[in-house]
Amino acid sequence: MNPVSLLSLSGERRSANWKPSSWDSNQIHQSLKSDFNDLQEKWHTELKQAVEQMLEAVAEPLQKLTLIDDIQRLGVAYRFEKQIDDALSSIYSNYAAEVSSKKDLLAASLYFRLLRQHGCYVSPDIFIQFKDEAGQFKASLGDDVEGLLSLYEASYLGIKGETILDDAKAFSTSTLENLMPHVEADIASRISHALHLPLHWNMRRMEARLYIDVYRENKKRRNDNLLEFARLDFNMLQVIHQRDLKDVSFWWDFLDLPRKLGFIRDRLMESFIFSVGLNFEPQFSECRKAATKDILLITVLDDIYDIYGSMDEVEIFNNAVNRWDLGAVDELPEYMQLCYLGLLNSVNELAYVTMKDTGRNVLDFLKKLWKRHFNAAVKESRWFHRQYTPTLEEYMENAQISIGAPLVLTHAYVKMLKYMPNEDVNHVDKYLKLISMMCYVFRLYDDWGTSKAEIERGDVPKAIQCYMHEAKVSEEIAREHIKNIINERWKELNEECLKATDLNRKFVAAVLDALRAAAFFYHDRDGFGEPDHKFKSQAMALFSQQV
């Protein structure tokens, strides 16, 4: 069918002039041919046992912390959860006094970061010993590059009111920036990578792929069994991820929306990378596939609401969603009918599979989520057509819903239920505060990377423009304000995670990982809407090139 036949051509249409996808289905299927044979699987199992024995055998606390840090950064900590839990709990109970008296910046920073990541409160006063009489971090710390890098990473686990960690972040950042021209190339590369995006904010799968190479070159620190296990595990997961991506690719090809609706973003690979960022572990294939479908549908409908659709059409579509009635399809413009049917079919399929797998009926719950999302989206359309600029607070109250992340996360929760036996869809309320806090920062990341281009092509003012209008300031000042909000909101998230002792740790990790995926895409670019050559290289490293 010619795409024009599905498009309403009455009236002037806005266009984002999106670049076509740099991936087509043939390219995806041809490039995803990794293999993992029985011999490799046997070797993987034997190496896993060797790493477990190594975790048991290492007694010295700093050595054990260093080993745990390597295991986490190599992306294989999920294979050793109980051993790591036991080790960190023991260190937390027995090592505090020792680490506070050693005056070892690397040890103190590593202890602080790993224990806080684990949900244990460690006082930031552990860093007082590294300050001079004037209350400044000692200049001599500049001689300890590894300690500085560790301090820098630890500072991002701070919560509100911990000024010593704000000082640590400022000191370590400026000192590392000054050191970069004077250190060896491999160390300068590590510093540059950390300063670009700290470990706590970075997408774990991307970090793992990079760290395998870093760890391989670090002959003083490297353990060959751990390196080989991480390499095999990465390749094993890559095969699973390839299978997931192929499955979603067939579904996307079947819908054929990019051809039928020529104005939309075709972002299959980008959507899948986000889903892997959200949940990379092997058992969560169905979660990844559902999240990818969600993101693709949200993106299509976002392009209709924000760019292509007239206000009348958007209102009609929104009414149809609120009715959630198959019969409403006949009232929609022809180009919207396929989107509406795709939405209903996708949600009904998710509800059906969840009922089959868990016995839980989640259909009403899912419908409520989608209605909430579209009601927020239509409000932004009304703002645009009325040329209304909301205050930053008013904008964010709505935009943290319209971003779509609440939908993706709650769908992820539903898909994870069969792996969380003590959880139920009725329990999701206890996660809403954490999800809401995450979505607030997610929206700010998105606006940070996309707002300039979106305003140029005609869209509702974003967070930066809302603050510029409200405070009568320049874009530079507004961006600095948004950057500060992101930093402060991360602190609030850190604190909420420390309190979240009654929440499922797998899902809490998924919430934070969704935000890390947002940081990956939007920290310094619009990596989703306008992916560049670097993005394609990163995607190939994750899904096509074996280690």
Swiss-Prot record:
Which residues are involved in binding Mg(2+) 2? D302, D306
The protein's required cofactor(s) are namely: Mg(2+)
* Residues spanning the membrane: none
Binding-site list for Mg(2+) 1: D302, D306
Q: List the catalytic activities from the record.
A: (2E,6E)-farnesyl diphosphate = (1S,5S,6R)-alpha-bergamotene + diphosphate
Mention any Pfam family matching this sequence. Answer: Terpene_synth_C
Q: Where does Mg(2+) 3 bind?
A: D446, T450, E454
Describe cofactor binding as the record notes it: Binds 3 Mg(2+) ions per subunit.
Per the record, its GO cellular-component terms are: cytoplasm
Swiss-Prot/TrEMBL keywords: Cytoplasm, Lyase, Magnesium, Metal-binding
Chief location of this protein within or outside the cell: cytoplasm
**Example GO biological process:** diterpenoid biosynthetic process
**UniProt keyword DNA-binding, yes or no:** no
What is the role of the protein in this entry?
Answer: Sesquiterpene synthase involved in the biosynthesis of volatile organic compounds. Mediates the conversion of (2E,6E)-farnesyl diphosphate (FPP) into alpha-bergamotene. Does not use (2E)-geranyl diphosphate (GPP) as substrate.
Family, per entry? Belongs to the terpene synthase family. Tpsb subfamily.
User: Domain remarks in the entry?
Assistant: The Asp-Asp-Xaa-Xaa-Asp/Glu (DDXXD/E) motif is important for the catalytic activity, presumably through binding to Mg(2+).
Q: How does it assemble?
A: Monomer.
What is the name of the protein in this document? Sesquiterpene synthase TPS3
Record the organism.
Cananga odorata (Ylang-ylang tree)
Top-level taxonomy? Eukaryota, Viridiplantae, Streptophyta, Embryophyta, Tracheophyta
